[in-house]
Design a protein with these regions (language model features):
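Active-site regions of metal-assisted phosphoester/phosphodiester hydrolases
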Residues: 1-65, 76, 86-87, 91-95, ...
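A short beta-strand-loop structural module common to alpha/beta enzyme folds
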Residues: 67-72
Length: 289
């Protein structure tokens, strides 16, 4: 027969002990989501221009920050960025690299966090297609991030020599604010896993996972990339492979989970990065034996 113990005023009931899973969940830091998505001008792999599919993929992602590439309004008369802003409720930051009388084409940044500073980085090289990057400082709310977050969203060129020059310019810009929590993301168009642009960026950011995002129906190439400084802020990286994402664009979105309120560590100095660049360049230029 069980005994019944009376509960007296002033008694404090002891909490039930946590299971190991509950304890791990309570100790885990909060996270937020960042994505990069080349939307191919809203044209799907079936050749149809359907912006609502892009909006649908963004709804699936539920990311807090999204870098977009190939955002186009020049040939359709349709303002893609305004449409996506209105459909999703994000703050929209344009970063056109081509501006003509009939519209614009280039990058964009969608964010739930208001920007406190935005500038454009010109990455154009010679007669190649104009390229650029959006360099935005976002004011994250308490509980998401301990300090302003710097986000650089870009789309690099198609030619190896072009990309090398563009990455050098990005490294110079990154070195202007050492120690600031930073995310660099976008379509880097780097087909070679050991190409110098990737090695330079991996050296600066202490590496990053590579995830295949192209082509969307059967991805084999990691053209879309994301790096974080400090490296410890990056929790996971994956491609978003929903049925809608496989048809809405020729790229899959790249989705990363970032730890909130990371410990800030000093980024490499510009001198250290320059030394690393020179060393990597010498190694790459040496003939194989």
């Amino acid at each position: 027969m069980s005994r019944i113990y009376p509960f007296r005023a002033g008694d404090v009931a002891e909490p039930m002990p946590q299971t190991p899973r509950e304890a791990a969940a309570a100790a885990a830091p909060a996270q937020f989501l960042v994505a990069s998505y080349n939307i191919h001008g809203g044209i799907g792999v079936d050749g149809r221009f359907l912006p609502k599919r892009i909006a649908g993929v963004l709804s699936e992602l539920q990311a807090d920050i999204v870098a977009l590439q190939e955002v186009e309004s020049r040939s359709t008369g349709f303002d893609m960025l305004a449409y996506l802003r209105d459909e999703t409720g994000y703050h929209a930051i344009p970063g056109p690299t081509l501006t003509r009388h009939d519209g614009e084409y280039g990058n964009a940044l969608l964010t739930r966090f208001p920007p406190s500073r935005v500038r454009q980085i010109d990455l154009s090289v010679g007669r190649h297609e104009p390229r650029g990057a959006i360099d935005a400082t976002l004011s994250c709310p308490d509980g998401v991030h301990a300090a302003p977050l710097r986000v650089i969203a870009t789309h690099l060129g198609l030619w190896p020599g072009e990309r090398r020059m563009q990455v050098r310019r990005l490294l110079t810009s990154l070195a202007e604010q050492p120690g600031v929590p930073t995310v660099l993301l976008g379509d880097v168009n780097e087909w070679f896993l050991w190409g110098r642009p990737l090695r330079w960026l991996h050296a600066y950011f202490d590496g990053a996972p590579h995830v295949a995002t192209f082509p969307s129906r059967m991805p084999v190439l990691a053209l879309d990339r994301l790096w974080c400084c400090p490296r410890s802020v990056l929790a996971s990286v994956s491609s978003h492979r929903s049925p809608l994402a496989r048809i809405a664009s020729d790229h899959l979105p790249l989705l990363a989970r970032l730890h909130a309120r990371p410990a800030v560590t000093a980024a490499p100095t510009s001198a250290a990065v320059a030394d690393e660049e020179e060393d990597l360049a010498r190694q790459a230029d040496q003939p194989s034996r």
